[in-house]
Every structure is written in structure tokens, then in C-alpha cells.
């Protein structure tokens, strides 16, 4: 009898775990370090309209408590910034979606910050962290999920941390910022880079009826079933558990929201209706697509070959993911490394089919002799100065 009881209990526990994992796996917005620090710097933000733009200017200092920085997962010190964003005042849906990542959902370096919160702190869902770390085994086709418990970026309780520049930014639900949000009304919390508003998860059950009840809106993403296709050396293997962005898939109708984690509806600020994005507590938390055209002010810097100097994460893959420089100002890969990563047929140059991300986007500009291939010489001429110097040293 005891054996039967134990067996039944085990089946029950497995069933509960399977249901939980099926939605989020290792993804979590409640795993950050405690926020006990009150900053000496004061929040300073102004949001004004000018012509056909909405201007957000701030010092990027949050108006709430934060975690301790530096910390074991994030060695950077939070400091004031000079941030200025021009946001479309009258946004329109584009003919196609734009991913926040350079090569599509969960692939490549970050291409755009998603938006800015009303307190002037930027919203940036993705991180430049990949399978294989930053060495020659780096595989940018598999971006590590910043909010996975398998990836330690030193996030605080607001799912935020600090970049090497000192800029504090959110990767997911900013708990301290939204702690006073009402559960019985819609609350706008920011603006997306394409100009559409961002709300926290509470919305009307009927998106076109402001008299309908307020409910918790949910995303339409879930974990994929089965195992990843990689061999564990050049690409990840193992079950889809939320460690990578591509461990998730969009299932239309699974939740209330579309693939961009938004929907069209009435809001208190837009009584005639608007498309709006939603920050959810389940994946993806911050949206990963734009339905409109994002402002260039939100493009992630670093030039044609750059990545904005993001910090290496410590993750469960050991040295593959450990930051390579003590000061954490990680450099983009050299020209030679880029050629090696993209040159799949090993002919020493990159074809238009082999090119990825910003190089693919600017292929015609880099291909100076217009022969349909990018050589090391052509790529070096297009690279930022610091990359040229490092390429010659290697």
C-alpha cells in the first residue's frame, strides 16, 4: 500500500511539474536579488511632445529601490546617464514585424531596446549572451534567455541590472516600479520604440468595452516540447527548458495576446482604441517584436560589427559563458572571427547567403567591388577603428 501511495504521489508531483514547465520552465521574473538600496541620486525624467514626436529625456535613475550593485553576477556600478529618445507620436502598424534581435526571434545580437518606462529607465528584454560564450564556439543562433534561472546576470528584484556604462535597465517585470499599480484598472507604464503605449498585465476582458471586468492578460507563448536539435558542442542539446529564447514558441490563441505580446483595444489614455503592448509575468514579460517601426534612437549601438559592449554572463555552461575581460567591457568579435563564424563553406569570404545580422543588412555597402562576396579586407574597412586594431594584432 505504501508503494502505491508513493507511486501515486510521485505521478501527481511529476504532473504538476510538467504543467509548470510547459509554460515557463526556468524562466522567472521573481528570482532576482532583494531590492534594499535607496539611491542617493534622484530620478529626473521629462516626457514632452514636439512636432510629430514624443521626447523622453532622463538621467536613467529609477524612482524606486534597487538591488546591490556591483554584485557577484554583475560587477558594474549604477550611475546617472544622459538619455534622450524621440518616439513616434502617431504610430502606425508596419507591413511586417520587427524583432528586437538582429537575426529574428532569439537569434543574433540585440538590435533594439524595446522602449522606455515612464520613469525614464529603458526596457531591454534581450542580452548578447549565446551558447558557447564569446569564443570560437559562439553560436549566435541560440541566445540565452536573460530571465532564465540558468543564467546569472546579477538581476535585482526588478529584473534589472547595470551595464558597463553604468546604465540601469529592465529585462522584465519592474516590480518596485509597478508595486502601486491597481489590479482593478489599466495602468500605462511606458512607451515602446515604435510609439505604441505599454501597459502592465491588467486589461479589459473585452478589449473594446471599458465597462467589462479587468483581468490578468496572459501571453500566448509556451515551452516547446521535446529536445533541442544540437549536439551540445556547436549548438545546444537537452530538453527545451527556458534557458534559451528559442526554447519558447508562439501558439495563437493560447493567451489573450498576439506574437508581439500586445493587442488592439480601448485604454484610459486612448478611449477610441489603440494597439498596445503588455508586460506579462510569464514569458516573454517584455515583448520581443514591434508591430510598428521602431525609432532609431532605440537601436543598440556598436556599429556594423558591434553589439553595444554587453557583459558576459555566468551560466551553467561553465567557462563558455564566463566574461572574458575583468572590467567587463566586452568587445565585439574581431574581423577574422566574424569571417570564420559566417564562412560556412570555408572559402575565406562571406557570401550574401552566409551573411547574418547587421552584415547581411549592410551587405551591399560592405561589398565594395560588388562581386557578391565580402572579403576580410572589405570587412575590415567597414569595421570600427578599435576592431581594426584588434584584428591586426590577432
Language model feature labels by segment:
Residues 19-21, 394:
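Boundary of Sec targeting at the N-terminus
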Residues 73, 153-160, 258-265, 348-349:
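Short, recurring structural edge motifs at helix starts
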Residues 343-347, 367-371:
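Acidic carboxylate motifs that coordinate Ca2+ or other divalent cations, activating on Asp/Glu
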Residues 21-154, 158:
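Solvent-exposed N-terminal domain segments of exported/luminal and surface proteins
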Residues 5-14:
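Sec-dependent N-terminal signal peptides
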Residues 338-339, 349-361, 376-387:
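Amphipathic regulatory helices of Ca2+-sensor modules
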Residues 194-196, 201, 205-303:
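Extended, compositionally biased non-globular segments
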Residues 117-121, 164-178, 270-284:
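Extracellular/lumenal glycan-associated surfaces
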